[in-house]
């Protein structure tokens, strides 16, 4: 896990847990960091890609880092939203989730997915062909797409399913942004965990920050992050 700090002199801290394959060097991720940096000292967490234990490799390292921050607000995107939902630190203030990976709508029966996930294999060999610009967002760059994950292992699927099935109750300070046309994660899982007044929809792909309508929504993201779901 890599954590990069953007400090423009803001007094408040934001822990930004990026999605699966997101890196700070990607132009659209940097755009999001720049927006947050107008109000926060941003601690951007880059999650490791091929894992076998979500708690040991995603949640616990982020939680250990967060313990040293004091008070902070929390923003998680996709797999970062899954990780952030499990994060329990004394200093957490408001929580905002962007297209959180709380469930996946795959074109296979759940029994088949569970069978594949049960295989004792850690090598990523199952191809992923859905993470293109149509799915991610119309502003997705060639570099961003080329550097994204192209396969997963059964062990990865197994630990992600465990993370999704063991989510703690949503906190009162949580809000979420998602697109109903998201083909990467299942937006219905957001509606199952948060009431409608704590959810805002946007037009675009899985990544708000890689979608051309991002300018219309990012101020509301900042409002929810700074002031909580009542700001929506």
Would you name each region that the model predicts?
Residues 1-51:
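Short, surface-exposed "cap/lid" segments of acyl-processing enzymes
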Residues 9, 67-70, 169-170, 228:
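Glycine-rich phosphate-binding loop signature in dinucleotide/nucleotide-binding domains
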Residues 15-20, 75, 98, 177-179:
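Short hydrophobic segments within beta-strands
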Residues 26, 30-34, 56-59, 184-192:
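Short, surface-exposed alpha-helical segments at coil->helix boundaries
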Residues 49-69:
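Alpha/beta-hydrolase active-site loop
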Residues 75-84:
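Gly/Ala-rich beta-loop-alpha elbow adjacent to hydrolase catalytic centers
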Residues 84-89, 187:
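Short, hydrophobic alpha-helix immediately C-terminal to the catalytic nucleophile
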Residues 94, 98-173, 178-185, 191-205, ...:
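The alpha/beta-hydrolase serine catalytic core
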